[in-house]
Amino acid sequence: MPVAALYDIHGNLPALEAVLEDVARAGADRVVVGGDVVPGPMPCETLVRLLELELPFQFIVGNGELAVLAEMNGRDSGAPARYRDSIRWNAAQLHPSEGELLAAWPTTLHMNMRGIGKVLFCHATPQNPNDVFTRVTPDDRLVSIIGETDADMVVCGHTHMQFNRMIGGLRVVNAGSVGMPFGDPGAYWLLLGPDSSIEQNTTWRWRRREFGRPIIPRLKNSPQITFCILHQRKRC
């Protein structure tokens, strides 16, 4: 049962559409959406597209959804000042029923997969969708923020960069970002299980999909293209 893990889409519908074509090519038969569908330039359209998937799908919540939900409910989003306009705009685009949908998403998801074992999906860490760690975070720090788990693999996102870490017997894999990657351009995602597009037998594999310049005007028409620019600059 190959599973596509799609993280950090951030309202980038053209990137999502490109990845969904790749998901079909790879033969995935289930999708896990790992949080931060919003905020971004096309929040409603992106959410609707995910809800229209013909494959079985499950969501987990990210820090982006939590910030937008806080704004929708009149609370402080806790977002840095440079992102607050984007959070407000996204909150204004979503219908209350869509907010209720986001609020129902769990923080973690567990799945047993042949060839991998127990897989724990979370946005950043199981305890906190805002936790930040990278490929160079010390092992002791990583162990402390992930906490106790009987999982064989933790799949996460949040930092928008793919990496693979082994901590004792636990593998931690960052799925990368569909809609706002740090690093080379493209739309990044993770396939768990066999990949029907290649002959090699794999238990998991990163995938990257390029998409052309014709999609750029679709994003530029949104006032929230500034959000994408600011988020990219944060890493500089």
Specify the residue positions occupied by each region the protein language model found.
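Beta-strand-turn-beta hairpins that frame and shape the catalytic cleft
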Residues: 1-3, 111-120, 167-171
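Active-site environment of divalent metal-dependent phosphoester hydrolases
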Residues: 10-15, 39-41, 64-69, 153-166, ...
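Active-site-proximal segments of metal-dependent phosphoesterases and phosphodiesterases across multiple
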Residues: 77-81, 115-148
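Glycine-rich phosphate-binding loop signature in dinucleotide/nucleotide-binding domains
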Residues: 23-27, 53, 113-115, 147-150, ...
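Acidic, His/Gly-rich catalytic cores of divalent-metal-dependent hydrolytic chemistry
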Residues: 153, 165-236
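Anionic-ligand binding region
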Residues: 136-173, 178
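Core catalytic region of metal-dependent phosphoesterases/phosphodiesterases
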Residues: 2-99, 103
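Hydrophobic/aromatic beta-strand patches that form the interior of the parallel beta-sheet core
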Residues: 32, 58-60, 122, 155, ...
